[in-house]
Each structure stands twice: as structure tokens, then as C-alpha cells.
Amino acid sequence: MKRATVSLAVALLPLVAAAQAPVRVDNKAIARRYFDEILNKGSASAIDSLVAPDVVFRNPPVVVKGIDDFRKLLAALRTAFPDLHFTLEDELAEGNKVATRWVMRGTQGTRKMDVSGMDMFLIEDGKIREIWVNMDTLAQAQQMGTVAGP
């Protein structure tokens, strides 16, 4: 009897994994839309459909809470870098979290920026609830001329 139970459990594992896969795929799609529609295209309406009202955005030392302040942050970013563009290099999903590795490119005045980083998203009820950013701020500062380069 034990052997039959174990065999049945092992046989059902692929079904359980397959049932969980769509959640990860949907969450990855939300993260992709964040980069494409919000960051790359600057779509204000995409913010409403993808971001939770009580979103928390962390890019140390900056912490932004709430969708209104998040909108202001994005507007300032797009003003500083009008041609801002993110290219996704990798993405991983586990449960309600999505990790992305990206390259951010843009121009501020005459200075070009090409910086790599990673984001971790917490997605609940189909909306981004939290974003953690980790990026190469030294490279960004060097490229923008605020810190001497190597």
C-alpha cells in the first residue's frame, strides 16, 4: 500500500508543477509589461493596470510609497532621460516573485548612460506590490560625470 501511495504521488508531481506554471508565466508577463509599457513607453494608463495603489519602490537610498509618488518618480526619470530604454536580459519567477536582469540606456544632455541592474517584483492579485532595485550606481555616476571614472 505504501509503495502504491508513493508511486501515485510521484506520478502526480508533473501535474502539480504544470498547474503552478501559469502563475509564474503571468507574473513574468506583468514584469515584462512594466518594463515595456511603463519604463520604455511612459504609459500612464499602464501604471493603473499594473501597479498596486500602495506600491513600495526601493532603490537604496530611495524608498517611494504609494502610486502617486511612484508616478512622480517615473516622470522625473523620464524627464532626466527622455530616450530611456530598458532591455531585459533574464527573468526568473517563483511563486509571487519575479526577478529580472536588465540594461538601462539613455541620454542626459550629451552624456550617454549604459548601466546594468536587477529588479525583484512582488506581485499580488495581478499587480506589482513591491519593487526592489539593485543597479550599478557607480557606473551610472561615472558615466554621468558626477564621479571620476577608472
Predicted feature locations:
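Short, surface-exposed coil-to-beta transition loops
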Residues: 85-86, 113-118
